[in-house]
Amino acid sequence: MPIQILPARLANQIAAGEVVERPASVVKELVENSIDAGATRIDIDIEKGGSKLIRIRDNGSGIPKDELTLALSRHATSKITSLDDLEAIVSLGFRGEALASISSVSRLTLTSRTVAQEEAWSAYAEGREMNVKLKPAAHPIGTTIDVVDLFFNTPARRKFLRADKTEFTHIDELLKRIALSRLDVTINLRHNGKMVRQYRAAQTKPQIEKRLAAVCGANFLQHALEVELEHGELKFHGWISSPEGARAQGDIQYCYVNGRMMKDKLINHAIRQGYESSLPANQYAAYILFIEINPHDVDVNVHPAKHEVRFHQARLVHDFIYQAIFGALQQGASLSNVVCNDQPLVEEQVIENKESYFPPMKEYVRQPQQSHYPKSEQLRVAVESTPSYPNKAPLDSWIPKSSTGNSSSKPSALPRSFHNNDKPAEKALSNYNELLTTQSRVQRESSSQVNEQSLTFSTTQQIERVAPQVTHVSKNDITLGKVLSVVESTFALLQQGKQLQLLNLRYAEFVKTYGQLSSVNVEPLKPQPLLIPLSVGIDESICNNLSNYASLLKSLGIDLKVKNRTNIIVMAVCQPIRQQNLQQLIPNLLRYLEQINPSLEQVIKWLSHQIQHDEVSYTTAQAIQLVMELEQLWGGKLNDFYPKLLKDIDITQVIQAFSHE
């Protein structure tokens, strides 16, 4: 059979296989189009579960007459025009496939009117020939789309539809998700002429609470904790259920990224980690959560139904969500204890109108300064209390590298569990403070008496339960000096007293990595499991001798499993090499071990030279960060690297030249 271009109808029907899975898929695409058009009211009419009729009417901006035909064409959209638009997408739709795909498997009528038009126009298309017919119509400003006889021309797809009740249930659940994502939009749903759902637009807090109760039930609202956390361009807010409001099934779990419905594995894992110590295995958390992130830092074009995204800083997002959830639950538990002790029970209060009564939600605001412990110890607590999981983000990735922290608070007497000579770097702890900054000083002062004792107890209890990761740091009895600027992209200009020096930043990266790996001489490096184990091909002879290197690899935190005679699976690696191209690094390492049979020290130096760094040019902030890490890792031993690491700059002749002019 020769290669040929597919007919437009067939191409659209193939695309419809991904876009139009069932009637709920049609509703999703069309309602999202209405929201993108700025609609504040959307009416949905369904007949026979959507197989007979799906009608979506909105009061959005409408579609001009000369664009109606184009709107039913494939890859036609008003939402993006270039790759830059795609990488910074803020609309729900952007592919331009929905209307063309839907019209190819149904009888579709698109009626619309804009503010600039005196009359509306209607476009009709059928699945067979895709010929679009235009005619005038009576219609207010906005758009109405009628989808009749879904899958009428694809019987194989139609027979896979479930009962009308089942299909409508999917539509109902979909609209619940949309109603929660856009509280400012009124949504009405009818089935077979009967009004089923009315979600009125909500602006005030009481209106929002009523809408939440209408979607999730009053029981969720009664046990809801309001959570809000912000870090730079990353924002996290919403409602989570307290452990008392846990459910027997995960039917109230809604998550949104930049307003887009998500069922993302990374997000779900972070939420489960946050609830891990609060819920038994047979119960499920309930939550409505919103994540707002710079569109450039997330790729939404990775899933056919856009249910998953790819974060550019996945570990940062994961840890951020975990800390917000875990902190809210801890704070909520503290408030609950006080309420139970000091306030009368709800049953004792007089409620005149039980139908409209919803108990106010507990509001959570992180307040680290209320602890008895100094700020640096509070930060250490937050880091150490985070449980281990695959690819857990390092502390430094939480904060901008340019941030610094100078704490003037003096250490106070600490419980036994706080005393540890092998503590993480003080600089890193002070940097971490940015995530724990209280949003309101007034809120902090007004509730300090309530939270001080309970927060101290819960924090101490968590530290005693989770063993902290030990980080060995050399005594810092030498300093490289102050970083003034970056010269020629890869050198840092330092000032040590009156002496100026030039630091080779690329060689400094090697020294840092060498120091991190050399800590294996004190204790084995901690393996960090890969989120997805990596299969790597190697020579059969190396695979047969893999057991000879097991002890050395284990001490370096590298966990390998034999898959077959020519393949191994990388299960975990240590932190210094986890960002590397393991597909190349691991086979090269095994070949090096096979050919040279090196000592541990030789392997450490070899690995340090192999590790590549992405920085083509360094910023001053990155140089400062690197200098501080070198000082903490090596201390006085930095002298051993001076010939290649650091060189003095003699400006005497330059100064003398000025004096002779």
UniProtKB/Swiss-Prot annotation:
Instruction: Quote the CDD domains the UniProt record gives.
Output: HATPase_MutL-MLH-PMS-like, MutL_Trans_MutL
Annotated Low complexity bias:
400-412
Positions of disulphide bridges:
none
> SUPFAM superfamilies under this entry?
ATPase domain of HSP90 chaperone/DNA topoisomerase II/histidine kinase, DNA mismatch repair protein MutL, Ribosomal protein S5 domain 2-like
Against Pfam families, the record matches this protein to: DNA_mis_repair (PF01119), HATPase_c_3 (PF13589), MutL_C (PF08676)
InterPro entries in UniProt: DNA_mismatch_repair_CS, DNA_mismatch_repair_MutL, DNA_mismatch_S5_2-like, HATPase_C_sf, MutL/Mlh/PMS, MutL/Mlh/Pms-like, MutL_C, MutL_C_dimsub
Q: Please verify whether the record's keywords include Iron.
A: no
For this UniProt entry, which segments traverse the membrane?
none
- Provide this UniProt record's keywords sorted from A to Z: DNA damage, DNA repair
Q: Name one GO cellular component term.
A: mismatch repair complex
Gene Ontology biological process terms from the UniProt entry: mismatch repair
Disordered: annotated segments: 367-424
Read off the PROSITE patterns from this record. DNA_MISMATCH_REPAIR_1
Tell me where on the tree of life, at the top rank, the source sits.
Bacteria
Q: List, in alphabetical order, the Gene Ontology terms for molecular function in this entry.
A: ATP binding; ATP hydrolysis activity; ATP-dependent DNA damage sensor activity; mismatched DNA binding
What family is this protein classified in?
Belongs to the DNA mismatch repair MutL/HexB family.
Function of the protein: This protein is involved in the repair of mismatches in DNA. It is required for dam-dependent methyl-directed DNA mismatch repair. May act as a 'molecular matchmaker', a protein that promotes the formation of a stable complex between two or more DNA-binding proteins in an ATP-dependent manner without itself being part of a final effector complex.
The name this protein carries in UniProt is DNA mismatch repair protein MutL
Organism from which the protein derives: Aliivibrio fischeri (strain MJ11)
What gene name does this entry carry?
A: mutL
